[in-house]
Amino acid sequence: MICPICASKSIVFQKAFRNNHPTFSNFSRFACKVCELHFANPMPEIEKLDAYNNSYHDSAHGGSERDLKQQAFFIGLAKTRLDFIAGQIGLENDHPYKILEIGPGPGAFVKVWKEKLPRSVYHVLESDKSCHKGLKEMGVKILDGKEEKLEDQYDFVILSHVLEHVTEPILFLRSFADKMKKGGHLFIEVPCMDWKHKTLDEPHLLFFDKKPMEVLLEQLKLTQLNIAYYGIPHQHLTNPLRQFFKRLRGFLWRKGIHYYHPERQKIKAIVKDDLQAQALLNFDAHKEYSSPAWWLRVISKKQ
């Protein structure tokens, strides 16, 4: 057994893998002593994993259709990601950027990007065909990575909550990094070591903190611009009192009851929408922390 990131053989057993779906049965979680990545072993059979991913939004999220409040959350979350990217490198609204997004799902980030940067040429790779109709209506080109040669010279490659589902991350990402133009950027968002605060490990196979992400970028010969913790800190996610108030705020949100929150105006300044701001209050998606939190956001550059 070797680490999927650094190829070290210095691996330590952590715990039996927690799952419900049979695709993830009889696994264990291991940790690399060198780069500190946590990962599943054995990895799922490719055929079973492909079948799961081809209906991912049904398997993991109960379908790709979203009600008004769910849409507000995902659109608002996408706006915080775009705000992070713009804050790191700057974006020109009238520039014809060429984008490749891997695993866009129903297309929340596509919608946000194209509204802000309408001259962009936007390509996607999405294995879940239930999402294709909506993506086509947004004016994107849907590529088939197995049958269609990817174009060269992308300005941005985008992966939000994709990399944690991959069995061979270096091989997977290198194929896309090679298609980036010189000076192009790779944006990644992944959960940060979410086995620490969740009751199940599935459907994630890789569990990142900053160190393994740094090693990953080195392996790809990409220059790290920023790796940052966003969302609720782990120490709050495992605090019973804070979780009680989180559930209470979630209840008020579902009932349509507004409440005071010190971050409301900061979020609204980013998302420019009352409903989206309300949807994000419980998640700190706009806020960077110095200690491990819900998500890692990563921006790197090809030199």
Go through each PLM region and give its residues:
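Short, conserved loop/helix-junction motifs that constitute active-site signature segments
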Residues: 116, 178-181
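A short His-aromatic
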Residues: 161-165
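S-adenosyl-L-methionine-dependent methyltransferase catalytic module, highlighting the catalytic core
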Residues: 148, 167-178, 185-301
